[in-house]
Every structure is written in C-alpha cells, then in structure tokens.
Amino acid sequence: MNLEELAERIRSFEGVTRKRQIEDIVSIFETVRPEYGNAIVDFGDDAAVIDIGGDDVILFAADGIWGRLLDASPWWAGYGAVVVNINDIAAMGGKPLAMVDIASANSSKACRELMEGLAEGVRKFGVPVVGGHVHPDTQYNSLSVAIIGIVKRDCVIRSDTAKPGDMVIAAYDMDGKIGPNSPYSWDTTSFKEPAVLRESYLVTQEIAQKKLATAGKDISNPGLIGTLGMLCETSRVGASVDLEKVPRPEGVDFEQWLKVHPGTGYAFTADPERAEECVNVFEKAGLTAAVIGKIEEGSKLDIYDQTGRVTVFDFSKDSITGICSE
C-alpha cells in the first residue's frame, strides 16, 4: 500500500470534498452571530447544542439524503435518513427524542417508499417521526430529516474539544455488510432486531455520563480519516493514526474501509488514563474498538504503518469544512 497515493485518494474522496462548501455557508450566518445567544454549540458539530435554561440541553440536527442514493432506492433513503440522524444525537452523548421530515416525490410510489423507509427506521429505533412537510408533485425525489435529542449539560460530547496527548479511538459495529446502493455504505442495522439496536445505541450515553471521552464524532461520509480530520480541524489540533491498529472486517478492501460510512461507527478521543475504559465500554456494547493513534500539537493529520508516514491533511493550508473553534 502506497501511503502517499492513499493520502491523496482520501483528500480527493467525494465524501471529503463535498464538505468544502460549508465554510462559505457558515460565513453568511456569521453576519447574524449576535442572535445565537442560546446556541452553546452550532455549526461544525454533529448536532447543535441549545441552552434551555436547566440541567438538560437540547440537541438539534438535520441530514439530507444524497440524490443519487435516493434515486437508487427511495425506501433505503427513508430508512437511512433515520439512521444518520440517530447517529448524530448518539455521537453527542444524547438521547434522541423525535424527528420531522421534508420530502419531495415525483410519484405516489416514490413518496410511499420514502415514508415506508422512514417508518421502518422508527420501528427499529423507537424514535418517532412526528410531522413534517411533503411536496407530492415535484419532478425529482428528495428527503431531509431533522431530529431533536436531549443530554445533560455537563455530558455533551463535542467535536472541538480534543487536546494534544489524547488518544484516538475508532469503534465500529463489525456485524455488517456493504450496503445495496453504495460501496461505501456499511449496513449494520437493517437486519437486526429493534431491541438489539436500541441497546447498542446506549453506549455513547454511558461514555458521556462517565465522561470517558474528550471529543468525538460519528464516522460519516468522509470515512474514518476524513471524520477524524473534521474533529482535528474544529479542535485546532493534529493527529497521528497507526493504520495497522484500525479495526477492519474481513473481505473488505482496506482503502474502501477507510472511506466507509458505517451504520454504527465512532471516532472518539480520550485522556490516556481513560482510553482503555472507553474502549472497554464500546466493546461491552458489541462494538469493536481500539486506540488507533494520538492527538498531536500542530495542524497535521498523519497516517503511518511499517512502510512510512505521510500527512493527509495540514490544516494550516488545507480544509475540510473550514470551521475552527474560537
């Protein structure tokens, strides 16, 4: 495996490059920054954190489904929209409460399939879709879902709080398979019973309550290295990752695996004295977890193995989202 070529393919991976417009979008809302008084966390994290004046805070997130995936299977788009939203709340250590959707459909068949997929997600995870809006007569299909959750104020797992010296932990549900509509989808939920899924998603709440993580994100479209890159970018730190320590399933190409968006997967950081306990909590919940690297001073995210070491991102000149904590 040529590390230089791997690094370049990660940088140019569509799951990474599609994040770049975020910087321009966020800059528009900086013009109204004084109105964000109740937002403890906003752009750049898996969910916004909203102050409601008590021990609990509201988590608020939204995801839209990529058009090409939606066209391949409206049902899967509906189901997947639930999964990714649940993951956003879980990654912050929270309990998901309810969702709303905005759907557009070019036929009654597509609309029904979208809604049936959403309903299956509700059945699996026990988080209801409580309303929304539908355009039943568009020339295209689209779906966006928003979710709210709740978490104790002092238990929020943010992505901009990693610090040099922290250990990097990757955790995956390995009981999965490549999904039907993308080589970068790792389905770990569609074939499992609701009770199993609901129990497994409590793991991040336990980690949050025990304060085992210093920062974290769910592994999303940019894959493991890209997701860790977003965490480093917002935390204003670098990282080094030992590729040989990354958990991986049998029968999946390793480069493909690094780009996978798993049904259940996390990139967390932890204090060295608590990293092993954090790994153990993931493992007890049925995930495969390992310390794969370390947060470093500086701006470079490096990967290495026995053959050498290369920089994937140098945030002094590169960007993924362009969002950095103040």
Where are these regions (language model features)?
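Acidic, Ser/Thr/Pro-rich beta/coil linker or hinge segments at domain junctions
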Residues: 1-5, 9, 13, 285-326
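Beta-strand->loop->alpha-helix junctions that form or flank phosphate-binding loops
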Residues: 39-42, 135, 219, 237-249, ...
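Short, compositionally biased
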Residues: 180-196
